[in-house]
Amino acid sequence: MGVQAGLFGMLGFLGVALGGSPALRWYRTSCHLTKAVPGNPLGYLSFLAKDAQGLALIHARWDAHRRLQSCSWEDEPELTAAYGALCAHETAWGSFIHTPGPELQRALATLQSQWEACRALEESPAGARKKRAAGQSGVPGGGHQREKRGWTMPGTLWCGVGDSAGNSSELGVFQGPDLCCREHDRCPQNISPLQYNYGIRNYRFHTISHCDCDTRFQQCLQNQHDSISDIVGVAFFNVLEIPCFVLEEQEACVAWYWWGGCRMYGTVPLARLQPRTFYNASWSSRATSPTPSSRSPAPPKPRQKQHLRKGPPHQKGSKRPSKANTTALQDPMVSPRLDVAPTGLQGPQGGLKPQGARWVCRSFRRHLDQCEHQIGPREIEFQLLNSAQEPLFHCNCTRRLARFLRLHSPPEVTNMLWELLGTTCFKLAPPLDCVEGKNCSRDPRAIRVSARHLRRLQQRRHQLQDKGTDERQPWPSEPLRGPMSFYNQCLQLTQAARRPDRQQKSWSQ
């Protein structure tokens, strides 16, 4: 499991040769990504190089005294293609330098001339960790395939498919992003590719993790302030658009009868997917103006739909950075968790906000209108006649709704819907013993029962009425009883609450 598994999920099981050529002779470079370090405007450099053998991805790092510290060469086609796709992606296009200026050209020439010495340093005892991870022999310049399957981002041991670390404490040359990847791989709440967990199946080719883990991963990468971390972050969050999930405690069946009925109920954590968060790379700030009048980001809104967005509007129209400017501005702040339940349903004047009203009404649709087992008014289902004018629901559905109402405290305007529920629901029981040859049904039969959770709802409604907290709630001009769904009835009530000038009627009347 690795944070870049989705980006190269189609790689299959392949080995990657680390080490590279003893001599470096390229005739064209592209997609240059630079990052400054204290004392050196060119501390990190990543780019694509074209030589007689083909295309390769090269990483290099210098210290504050402009001494070359590490370098790596990767010519795996899938990896170079992924880096090229990131370079061409609309959210990162303006962050790459496509035509190097004089300063960058001098750095490229220096790197080319010092390549053999850099590779020798990588093979020295100081680079033993990387050597062990690559599974290389002691022969200098001899590249052998790693013992473990998959590939890793050059200079790391954990950022890739699987890992190539000898033990859990090992880190690669780029220790900062490698540490972030290692901690993200250890997220305790995750769903592996094509696996089922927390009530959902992951049909993707990459692991999805809890939103808390993704948030910590994003913060960790941004705190590194280097180009390698930003490549990992932009690819994982922006290009792949990998979602995350939050866990919600819900009541569900934990033991079943052989005939399909529920034998025991319990509270279990169920996953709810959240749209991916956008990674604000430190290099992207070069495309923005540092003036004080820059736009401030809008506060995050509660997520209501599980859809993926292509990127925030402020990324559109970003200008290509100056070739001479290699210093990144201050990193943007990481957005907080987005798995916050909608709050503040009441408006400033006590009215219901439209967004909160829709959120409340959707709970009635999810738990009642879409209830799998229900008996319509004056209909017979599961060998039971519902003589009432309102639908009769399975106790599982009403129990989940009651728990939702108890936890989220919806506005009093929806209390009328509780009255329509009544205090009874039904459970499914196995069929009665049927004598062979008799014409009797072998289907489950419904048994109407008095539900304690519904009685508590009614008690709460009466308490609110006695306190007078709902006397100002409007009553729609048309009666709610009829074939209208609970969702539509809820919308009708909340719309009336937002228009106090309409005809109103107190519950106490």
UniProtKB/Swiss-Prot annotation:
Residues 150-291 are annotated as: Phospholipase A2-like. Disulfide bonds join C159-C181, C180-C220, C187-C213, C211-C244. GO terms for molecular function: calcium-dependent phospholipase A2 activity; metal ion binding. N-glycosylation does not affect the catalytic activity, but is required for proper secretion. A nonglycosylated form is observed in several cell types. The keyword Repressor does not apply. Keywords: Calcium, Cell membrane, Cilium biogenesis/degradation, Cytoplasm, Cytoskeleton, Disulfide bond, Endosome, Glycoprotein, Hydrolase, Lipid metabolism, Mast cell degranulation, Membrane, Metal-binding, Phospholipid metabolism, Secreted, Signal. Its EC number is 3.1.1.4. Residues 463-473 have a biased composition (Basic and acidic residues). Binds 1 Ca(2+) ion. Its cofactor is Ca(2+). Pfam families: Phospholip_A2_2. Belongs to the phospholipase A2 family. The phospholipase A2-like domain represents the fully processed form after N- and C-termini are cleaved off. It is the secreted mature form found in biological fluids. Secretory calcium-dependent phospholipase A2 that primarily targets extracellular phospholipids. Hydrolyzes the ester bond of the fatty acyl group attached at sn-2 position of phospholipids without apparent head group selectivity. Contributes to phospholipid remodeling of low-density lipoprotein (LDL) and high-density lipoprotein (HDL) particles. Hydrolyzes LDL phospholipids releasing unsaturated fatty acids that regulate macrophage differentiation toward foam cells. May act in an autocrine and paracrine manner. This is Group 3 secretory phospholipase A2.
